[in-house]
Amino acid sequence: TITSVLPKVGFKNTRYGNQLTLRHALSQSSGLPRHTYSHYIDQNMNYADVVSRLRYVNFVCPPGKCYAYQNVVYSLAGDMIKQKSGMSFESYVGKKVFEPLGMRTASYGLNSYNASPNRASPHIANGNRWVPTAVVSNWYKVAPAAGVNASIVDMSKFLLGQIGRRQDALPLAVLKPIQSRVTKNTPEQNYYGVRKAVDNTAYGLGWRVFDYGRNKNFVHHGGHVKGFRTEMVFNRDLQIGMVFLSNSETRLARDVIFKFLDMHERAQQAARAAKKR
């Protein structure tokens, strides 16, 4: 459990708190209210101080019984890794993921971002044009939930790992459990809303999972901090995937994954039609 590894982390309902596991945190089924204390991260509060306030929060359900998206609780995974491995979360991911996959320019943290000679600056809308804005450092504090710096080349390598092309680095024994449904959610909870063709939505371990049209088990996640938008979707069975990175808060990010999936569906339809000729 989380409290057995991190005894200084307390919860208001000690019975539920003592049941809370890493799996609950990663599958967004902690039982705490949606986005518990994310606003404190927005306000640039120290991460340790935010965690110390978890003891004041009422659970809305027992752990494992309901879905509610979290960033702070999710980031306890990093504290557990540090406690168990003796390595910081950032160093651990570098050693276990970035290096084996050859993600040579991927890193964590604002200092690494600023040290890169080839970095994209964030942009926000100002009227009908995009203007540069300062990097917001707040979310680098919750590294498991945010804070990766990576190029599209890095992310293409990560994508290949996720669809099983690099089993020397990410074996199926790792991929299958993290990409499988753990916590079911509703159209009101699932990020996609009520969208035609989207069905069977759930959260895995760090990933959203859904069916689309006649195809099953798409895996997806997106990101949004001031001046940046990202999306990634893939299907290991179909051996397809797409990564979208933008140094702006473009509206295109809201629809890009479904435009990609629709293109794939049309290609499948064309292939089926060609076989019938």
PLM features per residue range, with description:
Residues 1, 72, 154:
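Residue-level recognition of oxygen-bearing side chains
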Residues 1-33, 37, 55-58, 83-122, ...:
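Active-site helix/loop module of the DD-peptidase/beta-lactamase fold
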Residues 10-13, 36-41, 62-66, 79-83, ...:
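Second-shell loop/turn segments in exported
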Residues 21, 72-73:
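Mid-domain, small-residue-enriched loop/turn segments at the edges of structured enzyme/sensor domains
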Residues 38-41, 67, 109-113, 190-194:
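Short coil/turn segments at secondary-structure boundaries
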Residues 45-46, 82-95, 99, 117, ...:
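Catalytic loop of the DD-peptidase/beta-lactamase superfamily, centered on the K-T-G motif
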Residues 48-60, 126-140:
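The feature captures the short pre-catalytic strand/loop hairpin that immediately precedes
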Residues 73-78, 156:
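Well-ordered alpha-helical segments within folded domains of soluble proteins
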